[in-house]
């Protein structure tokens, strides 16, 4: 184990601690499992800190390091504050990459995955994250997916899991179904890059639409979520309130009436066209009703163009890609008694609403574009304020050209215009009358679709269904779970492997005993990750999915850390499963995550050859200083060593393809894990992108080194040492502690200032971690360490200085745990025996709360320092004095003085500043150490 952590040790540079002690401390740091056995004491505060578990790709990247550093920092603080903390780690282990790797490396997906898990576990331990390793789980282990299958059966029994034939996205290369979100904007597969095809297949779904309202409404009960993420969820669910309006077919041959969903029923008189999707269910009937073969050929050509656009642009909607087709057919509208032309438009989606819309170009941007392309008339039907109407008329007169703005809504009067017999009626009255006459019907519509969970892949959770010709789809009995994946297989990657394994697929029907077959689809990996946070709380339970008692005590998760890329689907699916399990009375909570912390990307310079535009590895980049022949000035150029071409530099997300990734192990080998984690937390707020900067990590290393020097210098000053600057054999007398009874006035003030800053820092660091502004907490620690470093030699002999060093060391623990552990032990154990009674014994309860327990040299057992109220009371404050914004002095004044203006104006040092001048304004502000006052003067 020592070899695994050697890199962390050698970068600490601690001269007074031998390697054996250092090794023991670090191993203690890695293997401590504070919460191996959960206490069942309900009076004990709980805290569940969770980072999104990784896919075991084999190598950690800096994005991983950042997310786990954040959750680890929070968990360490909460443990020190006395919370019963859950901070687990596991593996989201199913999925396509394992199958692809199995093909490339000629190993089974299981073997490849388990090797990667072992490797990444070691990497995480090298980073010294304090995870509860006893809770470790992997979604590809049968002990886990047995319960994923149990959830499926419960959903099936509740009518929330079902199978139906559906048009799916088919990847012709990977031979699998893709969810919509796995198809990029160009209509290509997210992994194979193949052009995705449409295919009809029977698929399994979870009925997430049944909870669309709860999933929307309950977002308002989550103050710990950002508005950005909540809005993303709401937009994905897409709830809207409106009405259904029917348009009657006037076709000669069979053609159904078309019903539209609209949120603006009051605009019915402004309808210029009826538009449907080119993929509408009635498209064949429409084709049959076209006037002649020439028109049908035009339709076929149009549909071909639409498919080409879809393959190229996917779901992107751009005016340039708008394609419409006038069928020449009309539909009758009973409300307006008008005949409306039927248009095909690729801006209408077949799977949203009814797949048809009524076009009101006077009051809708997209409708306006269709009308413009088809040369249809605009008819405004919503009244606008008179003043705005006049402005609009003036604008039209001035420009004398068509303006697109004419189709948009203005401030409405609430009354209809140009609406026949209904002109002048208020909107609400008009809609109510249509509802009463049953001409329109209220409808709530959702953009979200049911969750397609079927995947035609081998490496996933088997769906526990047996297909029988007599009995249909039969659920596997719970006592026969798990339905295990066959592990000893030869994987080729062609088609669905499970469908080819007759010995696994062919079984007896549990109901009738007839020959039957297993369902060969496996589950979407999002199913596995939709409930893993619950299993962490009882990961070894072989009798039930989890203990409801434990889950009810520790859920919901207090802080969930992960990337913004999972802000929609993973969170939505987890919320759905949580609500279902509550309905099943397995848990008490309906929302899984109290606080979401979505961290930003980790970025670094990307170098590209200016000619080929190909990424270049940093080792092949050279920085040259070149003098210009004309000006003689020096210019720095970035050159590709391999080609001699100039290099462009951009700051982008770290990735293998861009050759701009930073290997965490290399950084740990050079700087140590503590320095890396401190840098990550200090460099940028967690929600912002972190731009990698070598100078920044060097700065963090130097800061920790300075703290080490301060602590070692304090301890060394009590030793008898050989005088280095005196005669060779002359000895310098060791120092003695300085008690408060011997302080002079200046020393008394300096000690009070140190204690004030120390206790103020306790508040600042606590607040910074609780508010996830870790950089401000580290900045406060830097200020405190600088203050201690600059203290006068005599002050460094005081008990108060020693106590401040202890507090500083304790507060470093969430950020730099190994560093904190070693220095805490040193501050407790390495004091000379003659000094221990003065510095570290007989602490009051208040002192122990602030500076730790002197009888325990293990920082893991220490409590988080709490400020003492009396230490935050100051006799003097500093007053920064400015004139016209320029600082001219800093005065130390008694806290009893509150009239700063009078104090300055009566001070002889500043009288000349006011001579022959008239004060214009006086500004009072606050500073870190007191207040500021700024006098501005009137200009003559």
Curated annotation (Swiss-Prot):
Transmembrane segments: none annotated. ATP binds at residue 641. Belongs to the class-I aminoacyl-tRNA synthetase family. A motif ('HIGH' region) lies at residues 54-64. GO terms for biological process: Group I intron splicing; leucyl-tRNA aminoacylation; mitochondrial translation. It is found in: Mitochondrion. Disulfide bonds: none annotated. GO terms for cellular component: mitochondrion. It catalyses: tRNA(Leu) + L-leucine + ATP = L-leucyl-tRNA(Leu) + AMP + diphosphate. GO terms for molecular function: aminoacyl-tRNA deacylase activity; ATP binding; leucine-tRNA ligase activity. SUPFAM superfamilies: Anticodon-binding domain of a subclass of class I aminoacyl-tRNA synthetases, Nucleotidylyl transferase, ValRS/IleRS/LeuRS editing domain. A motif ('KMSKS' region) lies at residues 638-642. The gene is mleuS. This is Leucine--tRNA ligase, mitochondrial.
């Amino acid at each position: 184990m020592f070899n695994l952590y050697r890199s962390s040790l050698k970068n600490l540079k601690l001269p007074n601690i031998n390697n054996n002690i250092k090794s023991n401390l670090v191993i203690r740091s890695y293997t401590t499992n504070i919460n191996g056995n959960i206490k069942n004491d309900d009076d004990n505060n709980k805290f569940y800190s969770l980072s999104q578990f990784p896919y075991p790709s084999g190598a950690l990247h800096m994005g991983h390091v950042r997310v786990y550093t954040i959750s680890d920092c929070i968990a360490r603080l909460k443990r020190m504050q006395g919370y019963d903390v859950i901070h687990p780690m596991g593996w989201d282990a199913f999925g396509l990459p394992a199958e692809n790797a199995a093909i490339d490396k000629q190993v089974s997906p299981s073997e490849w995955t388990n090797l990667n898990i072992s490797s990444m576990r070691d990497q995480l331990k090298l980073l010294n994250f304090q995870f509860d390793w006893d809770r470790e789980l992997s979604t590809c282990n049968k002990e886990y997916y047995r319960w994923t299958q149990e959830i499926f059966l419960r959903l099936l029994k509740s009518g929330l899991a079902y199978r139906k034939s559906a048009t799916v996205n088919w990847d012709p290369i990977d031979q699998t179904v893709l969810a919509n979100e796995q198809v990029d904007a160009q209509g290509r597969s997210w992994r194979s890059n193949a052009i995705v095809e449409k295919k009809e297949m029977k698929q399994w779904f979870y009925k997430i639409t049944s909870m669309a309202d709860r999933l929307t409404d309950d977002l308002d009960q989550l103050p710990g979520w950002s508005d950005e993420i909540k809005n993303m969820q709401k937009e994905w669910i897409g709830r809207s309130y409106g009405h259904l309006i029917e348009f009657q077919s006037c076709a000669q041959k069979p053609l159904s009436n078309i019903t539209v969903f609209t949120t603006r029923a009051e605009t019915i008189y402004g309808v210029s066209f009826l538009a449907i999707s080119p993929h509408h269910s009635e498209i064949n009937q429409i084709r049959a009703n076209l006037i002649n073969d020439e028109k049908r050929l035009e339709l076929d050509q149009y549909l071909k163009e639409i498919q080409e656009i879809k393959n190229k642009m996917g779901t992107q909607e751009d005016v340039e890609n708008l394609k419409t087709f006038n069928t020449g057919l009309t539909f009758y509208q009973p409300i307006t008694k008008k005949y409306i032309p039927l248009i095909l438009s690729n801006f209408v989606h077949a799977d949203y609403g009814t797949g048809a819309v009524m076009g009101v170009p006077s009051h809708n941007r997209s409708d306006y574009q269709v009308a413009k392309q088809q040369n249809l008339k605009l008819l405004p039907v919503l009244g606008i304020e008179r003043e705005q109407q006049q402005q609009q008329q003036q604008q039209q007169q001035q420009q004398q050209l068509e303006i697109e703005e004419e189709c948009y809504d203005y401030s409405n009067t609430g009354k209809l215009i140009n609406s026949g017999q209904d002109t002048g009626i208020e909107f609400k009255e008009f809609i109510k009358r249509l509802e009463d006459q049953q001409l329109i019907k209220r409808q709530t519509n959702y953009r979200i679709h049911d969750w397609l969970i079927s995947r035609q892949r081998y490496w996933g959770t088997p769906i526990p269904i047996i297909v029988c010709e007599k009995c249909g789809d039969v659920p596997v009995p719970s006592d026969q779970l798990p339905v295990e994946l066959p592990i000893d297989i030869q994987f080729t990657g062609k088609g669905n492997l499970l469908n080819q394994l007759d010995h696994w697929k062919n079984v007896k029907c549990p109901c009738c005993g007839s020959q039957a077959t297993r369902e060969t689809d496996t589950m979407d990996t999002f199913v596995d990750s939709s409930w893993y946070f619950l299993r962490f709380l009882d990961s070894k339970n072989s009798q039930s999915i989890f203990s409801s008692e434990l889950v009810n005590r520790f859920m919901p998760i207090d802080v969930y850390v992960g990337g913004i890329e999972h802000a929609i689907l993973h969170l939505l699916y987890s919320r759905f499963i949580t609500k279902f399990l509550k309905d099943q009375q397995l848990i008490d909570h309906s929302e899984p995550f109290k606080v979401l912390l979505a961290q930003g990307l980790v970025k670094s310079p990307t170098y590209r050859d200016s000619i080929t535009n190909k990424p270049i590895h940093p080792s092949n980049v050279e920085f040259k200083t070149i003098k210009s022949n004309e000006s003689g000035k020096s210019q720095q150029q970035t050159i590709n060593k391999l080609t001699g071409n100039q290099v462009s530099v951009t700051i982008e997300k770290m990735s293998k393809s861009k050759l701009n990734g930073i290997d965490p192990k290399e950084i740990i080998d050079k700087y140590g894990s503590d320095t890396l984690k401190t840098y990550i937390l200090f460099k940028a707020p967690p929600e912002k992108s972190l731009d990698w900067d070598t100078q920044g990590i060097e700065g963090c290393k130097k800061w920790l080194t300075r703290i080490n020097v301060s602590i070692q210098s304090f301890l060394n000053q009590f030793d008898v040492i050989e005088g280095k600057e005196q005669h060779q054999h002359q000895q310098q007398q060791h120092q003695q502690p300085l008690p408060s009874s011997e302080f002079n006035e200046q020393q008394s003030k300096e000690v009070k200032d140190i204690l004030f800053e120390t206790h103020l820092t306790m508040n600042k660091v606590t607040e910074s971690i609780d508010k996830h502004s870790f950089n401000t907490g580290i900045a406060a620690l830097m200020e405190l360490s600088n203050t201690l470093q600059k203290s006068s030699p005599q002050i460094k002999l005081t008990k108060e200085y020693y106590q401040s060093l202890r507090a500083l060391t304790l507060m470093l623990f969430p950020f730099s745990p190994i560093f904190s552990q070693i220095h805490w032990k040193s501050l407790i154990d390495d004091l000379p025996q003659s000094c221990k009674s003065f510095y570290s014994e007989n602490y009051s309860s208040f002192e122990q709360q602030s500076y730790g327990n002197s009888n325990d040299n293990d920082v893991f057992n220490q409590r988080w320092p709490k400020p003492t109220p009396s230490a935050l009371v100051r006799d003097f404050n500093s007053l920064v004095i400015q004139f016209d914004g320029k600082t001219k002095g800093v005065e130390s004044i008694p806290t009893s003085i509150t009239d700063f203006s009078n104090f300055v104006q009566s001070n002889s040092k500043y009288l000349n500043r006011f001579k022959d001048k008239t004060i214009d304004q006086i500004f009072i502000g606050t500073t870190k150490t007191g207040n500021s006052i700024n006098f501005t003067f009137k200009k003559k």
